[in-house]
Amino acid sequence: FVLPGNNLVTPSAECCSSLSAVNTGCLCETINILSSLPANAAFHQSAAGIFDIGLYMEAKANETRWSLFSFPRVFLFE
């Protein structure tokens, strides 16, 4: 998993290799889209702050897949 602020786990060599192979332009554009979602989505103001949106990266033998997900902040790692 690649989660912002997650300092609990040292990334594996496979994870580092997969991340280094990612097209940075594509990744930057994806992050820009993610960061604009709360402002552009039709969330009620009180609901907009209770979900975090992130990327899940799965790396398997020369194949990297990215998935968009959201989760309630109450389940974030502290």
Curated annotation (Swiss-Prot):
State the InterPro entries in the record: Bifun_inhib/LTP/seed_sf, Bifunc_inhib/LTP/seed_store
Where's it mainly located?
secreted
Where is the protein found, in the record's own terms?
Secreted
Q: Name one GO cellular component term.
A: extracellular region
Matching entries from Pfam families are given as: Tryp_alpha_amyl
Name the tissues where it is expressed. Answer: Tapetum of anthers.
Does this entry carry the keyword Transferase? Answer: no
Keyword annotations for this protein?
Secreted
Determine the domain of life of the protein's source. Answer: Eukaryota
| Membership in a protein family | Belongs to the A9/FIL1 family.
Q: Which PANTHER family does this chain map to?
A: PROTEIN YY1
Q: What is the protein name stated in its UniProt record?
A: Protein M6
State the organism's lineage. Eukaryota, Viridiplantae, Streptophyta, Embryophyta, Tracheophyta
List the gene name.
Answer: M6
